[in-house]
Each structure stands twice: as structure tokens, then as C-alpha cells.
A protein has these predicted regions:
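Short, well-ordered beta-strand segments
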Residues: 5-9, 57, 81, 104, ...
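A late-sequence structural motif
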Residues: 18, 170-213
Length: 219
């Protein structure tokens, strides 16, 4: 149906690397119709699916598998990150060593925040275990704060791929922190549309696996 609106969303973490995943090529197949594309945190995207504003979303946060059908697209590393020249209060070897550093976290409803909260909780820690906590809802601002040496954070390697490559940010090596999480295409549970979303998922996987095209242009 070329007139049907394709309404979908991705989380803020995923949107940071989503254009690099060749989303344009995926969307080209639906250029004859209308597209509604949203970027929000996991909680808000799931609410928009519930109210039928979105057909599906790509999320990294947790969701109720009794309510939603899903297809796993990929699994991504969740890593501690800081500025390349960040000066730590002490030698860093394990997660507990970071507690003397200021922590930057995402807003309530963020899948990234929930994952970090769960990891800390499994070890009987909380955000308050850190020296100070700053809550920022924008990943771009978070990156700038990191580059300025304002603290450390935990996020998906994909979201800072460029910064890690260029050397403005670095992964903090920890001997006791090895976390990966699934990115999934999620929609309201129904037996009628699984084949349709399975096809979408395969198209997305293909787009995500295509190499980035570097253009020699100045912006």
C-alpha cells in the first residue's frame, strides 16, 4: 500500500549510529508513500506503539515480551567512556574504581539508563554510589561534556563509534565489565503481521551490514 504511512521510531542511542547503518537505503523502498520517523527514549516509543502512533520501533531497552512481538536485529557492546585525556582520581581497574568519578546518565525512560541501573543493582550498587550524578537527555550534549572532562558515562559503542575512531573519546577498560545488549524491532503482539515485520527486519539487517560510504565533500 503506497499510500500507507510507515510510522516507526528509534531510540536516541540507536539514532546516533542509525544513518551510518544506511537507513536511507531502507527508506528508499518506501519513498512512494508517507514516512513518520520518531526519535525518543524506549519508554516513550513503546507508549507510542501502544497508542498506534507508531507501527514499530527499534529499541535497546527492556520491554514486556507478553505484550510485544520482536525480532533481534543485532547485539551491541555497552561500554564505559570518557575523554581521551580524562584524569582519574585513582588507578582504574574495575567498576568500583569509577565510583569516585562524576557520572553522566540519561533521562528516566531511557533504555541505556535502565541497563546501567540493572547492572549496578545486580552488584548491590546504585547511581548514588558515584561521587556525583548529572542527568542529561541529549546524547550530543553528553558527548560534549565528556570531551570537556566533565565526567564519565556508559553507552553503546555504536553511539560513539566516530569519537572513538577519531580519538576524542576512549573506552575505559574494566576487568569486570563486559556487557552487551540486544537491539530489537518491536511491535504490538499480533499473529497477522509477523511475516511483514520479519521482512522489514531482514531489510534493516542488510542495511546495517552495508559498509559506510565516505564522500569527499565539505559541508
Amino acid at each position: 500500500d503506497r499510500q500507507k504511512t510507515l510510522a516507526f521510531g528509534v531510540t536516541k542511542s540507536i539514532s546516533e549510529g542509525f544513518m551510518k547503518m544506511r537507513i536511507n537505503r531502507f527508506l528508499e523502498k518506501y519513498a512512494g508513500g508517507r514516512i513518520y520517523f520518531a526519535v525518543n527514549n524506549t519508554r516513550q516509543l513503546l507508549e507510542e506503539i501502544n497508542t498506534m502512533k507508531l507501527d514499530f520501533a527499534i529499541v535497546e531497552g527492556n520491554f514486556d515480551k507478553n505484550i510485544y512481538d520482536y525480532i533481534v536485529l543485532t547485539k551491541e557492546r555497552f561500554i564505559p567512556v570518557c575523554a581521551a585525556d580524562y584524569v582519574f582520581k585513582k588507578e582504574i581497574a574495575c567498576l568500583e574504581d569509577l565510583f569516585e568519578e562524576p557520572l553522566i546518565i540519561r533521562e528516566q525512560g531511557s533504555g541505556s539508563r535502565e541497563i546501567l541501573e540493572n547492572v549496578l543493582g545486580s552488584r548491590n550498587y546504585t547511581f548514588q554510589s558515584f561521587r556525583s550524578v548529572m542527568e542529561i537527555g541529549d546524547i550530543g550534549i553528553t558527548k560534549e561534556l565528556l570531551k570537556d572532562g566533565s565526567g564519565i558515562t556508559f553507552l553503546y559503542e555504536m553511539a560513539v563509534k566516530q569519537e572513538l575512531k577519531e580519538g576524542s573519546l576512549k573506552e575505559i577498560p574494566l576487568r569486570d565489565f563486559d556487557v552487551c545488549h540486544e537491539f530489537a524491532l518491536v511491535w504490538l503482539k499480533t499473529k497477522h503481521f509477523y511475516d511483514y515485520y520479519q521482512k522489514l527486519a531482514e531489510e534493516l539487517k542488510t542495511s546495517m551490514s552495508e559498509p559506510e560510504i565516505v564522500k569527499n565533500t565539505q559541508i
